[in-house]
Amino acid sequence: MADQETAQSPIEEPSESAAQAAAETLADAEIPATDAAADASEGVVDDIDVIPPSDPEHLTTVVRGQDTAAAVRTAAIFDEDDEDEDDDGDEVGNDLPSFRKRDARDASNADDPDAAVMRKKKKKRHHSPEEASSMRHVTDGEVEQEEEDPYANMTEAEIRRARTDRMIDEALRAGKKKAPRKRAGEDDLDLLADEEVAALRREMVTAADDDEEANRLKKPATNKLKLLPKVVATLQKNHLQQSILDNNLLEGVKRWLEPLPDKSLPALNIQHQFFQILERMTIDTISLKMSGLGKVVVFYSMCSRVEPKIKRSAEHLIEVWSRPVLKRSSSYRDRHIASAEWNREALSQRAGPLVVGSVADNNRRNVGIPQAVTAGFRVAPQSVAGQRSDSGHEARMANHKRLNQFKSRLKEAKR
């Protein structure tokens, strides 16, 4: 009768104390890592029929031919898998005893094949950093739709490679973004430079007019001297050179260098400062025509009241500025130097009278006074050491000439 009752009632409900005793027995027991043990564990899984419990306080299992500890272990594994698959909001995992999860980990660490298979079902999904951050920010009462994982069908190596490529692309895109040239007031630096130069030009013209008026009234003209440090500081700034040419600040320089109404020249410190700055500046032909500065510089090169140093500076400026007008290159390599071949007969004919005079004066006992000889040579001697017989030198010179012509055309096109 007992056997029949057991067959008719295949479901047993062990008490809570029995489950705890079985768990303690399982924790103290050692599972041998042999082939026989593995076969035995596989047989346990095959002989067990598991019914997921609706009540978390009871475990319902049917065991045929095995002990209670193995049944509890297998039920714990299946219950843990059911907890992962259950998304209906019931807090089943929180009510279950904690020894079940430890048992599942111990089973996987003990090389249990069935436990390893069950653990593989709980693989975590790989989410990108953007997806993880978006999934964390979920407002109350709203359910965020799960986005598709781009790394779902990739291996670990492919995921690492894809993430590395993505980081490289983001770094390259970030490097292409150039911050605009802005200041704290969000103003363009070029616009600020133009405004600064234009304001200074107006101040220079006003100071020149005031000094001319004071000179007519026989009063001291000191307005230009007061403004001179500011003008010199602005002209010496390299980043303002283009703005100086565009806003025609050279017109103010011309007004300051012009003679006053009583035919007197401006102050010497104004002359020295301006000519030193003009020698360092690169001024194009169009800016010279607009400002009219060339006429004033020619006047300084021809005036006898100008100091020799300033006069030499004016002559040098005229030589440099006139080369583009005469279509001559400013490069020293392209400059033509007059040379002549050595002619011994011409030299002997030129030295003949000197020899005769020296013979006639041999009877004189007194010594002649040495006289200065002007060494103004116009013809350079022909260089023999630097001659090149190869034709490659001529080809390089021709290429250099074509390059200079192309540069000059490019400058004219930009203007």
From Swiss-Prot:
Residue ranges annotated as compositionally biased, kind Basic and acidic residues, are 98-108, 128-140
**PROSITE patterns the record matches:** TFIIS_N
Composition bias type Low complexity, residue spans: 7-40
The TFIIS N-terminal domain extends over 251-328
- Quote a single Gene Ontology cellular component term: nucleus
Q: Where in the cell is it found?
A: Nucleus
Here the segments flagged for biased composition (Acidic residues) are 78-93, 141-150
Show the InterPro entries listed in the entry.
Answer: RNAPII_TF_IWS1, TFIIS/LEDGF_dom_sf, TFIIS_N
- Biased region (Basic residues) positions are 118-127
> Keyword Transferase, does the record have it?
no
Disordered: region residues: 1-154, 381-415
What's a BP term from Gene Ontology annotated to this protein?
A: poly(A)+ mRNA export from nucleus
Sorted alphabetically, the keyword list is:
Nucleus, Transcription, Transcription regulation
- What's the stated role of this polypeptide? Transcription factor involved in RNA polymerase II transcription regulation. May function in both SPT15/TBP post-recruitment and recruitment steps of transcription.
Q: What family does this chain come from, according to its entry?
A: Belongs to the IWS1 family.
Q: What is this protein called?
A: Transcription factor IWS1
Gene name, please?
IWS1
